[in-house]
């Protein structure tokens, strides 16, 4: 019975570690959003306010996916 508990605990840790790989995509997505924002500012400086609001929406959606991955990792680890 003790071996089964050890296997269960180790599989929870492995699953939690794999679930956090979604955070890599969120980090890359935020970099892409703000990189494209800088390019858009340099091409059309007159639209800075409008472009910045679009970038914040993109940032929020990208971070939401990352937070969902983090929540799933904690659920796998502790439940």
Curated annotation (Swiss-Prot):
Pfam families: ATP-synt_C. PROSITE patterns: ATPASE_C. It is found in: Mitochondrion membrane. Keywords: CF(0), Hydrogen ion transport, Ion transport, Lipid-binding, Membrane, Mitochondrion, Transmembrane, Transmembrane helix, Transport. GO terms for cellular component: mitochondrial membrane; proton-transporting ATP synthase complex; proton-transporting two-sector ATPase complex, proton-transporting domain. GO terms for molecular function: lipid binding; proton transmembrane transporter activity. GO terms for biological process: proton motive force-driven ATP synthesis. InterPro entries: ATP_synth_F0_csu (IPR000454), ATP_synth_F0_csu_DDCD_BS (IPR020537), ATP_synth_F0_csu_sf (IPR038662), ATPase_proteolipid_c-like_dom (IPR002379), F/V-ATP_Csub_sf (IPR035921). It is a multi-pass membrane protein. The record marks 63 as: Reversibly protonated during proton transport. It comes from the Eukaryota. The chain crosses the membrane at residues 21-41, 59-79. PANTHER family: ATP SYNTHASE LIPID-BINDING PROTEIN, MITOCHONDRIAL (PTHR10031), ATPASE PROTEIN 9 (PTHR10031:SF0). Mitochondrial membrane ATP synthase (F(1)F(0) ATP synthase or Complex V) produces ATP from ADP in the presence of a proton gradient across the membrane which is generated by electron transport complexes of the respiratory chain. F-type ATPases consist of two structural domains, F(1) - containing the extramembraneous catalytic core and F(0) - containing the membrane proton channel, linked together by a central stalk and a peripheral stalk. During catalysis, ATP synthesis in the catalytic domain of F(1) is coupled via a rotary mechanism of the central stalk subunits to proton translocation. Belongs to the ATPase C chain family. F-type ATPases have 2 components, CF(1) - the catalytic core - and CF(0) - the membrane proton channel. CF(1) has five subunits: alpha(3), beta(3), gamma(1), delta(1), epsilon(1). CF(0) has three main subunits: a, b and c. This is ATP synthase subunit 9, mitochondrial. It comes from Acanthamoeba castellanii.
């Amino acid at each position: 019975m003790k071996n089964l508990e050890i296997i269960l605990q180790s599989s929870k840790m492995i699953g939690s570690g794999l679930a956090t790989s979604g955070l890599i995509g969120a980090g890359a997505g935020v970099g892409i959003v703000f990189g494209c924002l800088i390019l858009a500012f340099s091409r059309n400086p007159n639209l800075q306010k409008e472009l910045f609001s679009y970038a914040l929406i993109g940032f929020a959606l990208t971070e939401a996916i990352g937070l969902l991955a983090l929540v799933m990792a904690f659920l796998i680890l502790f439940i």
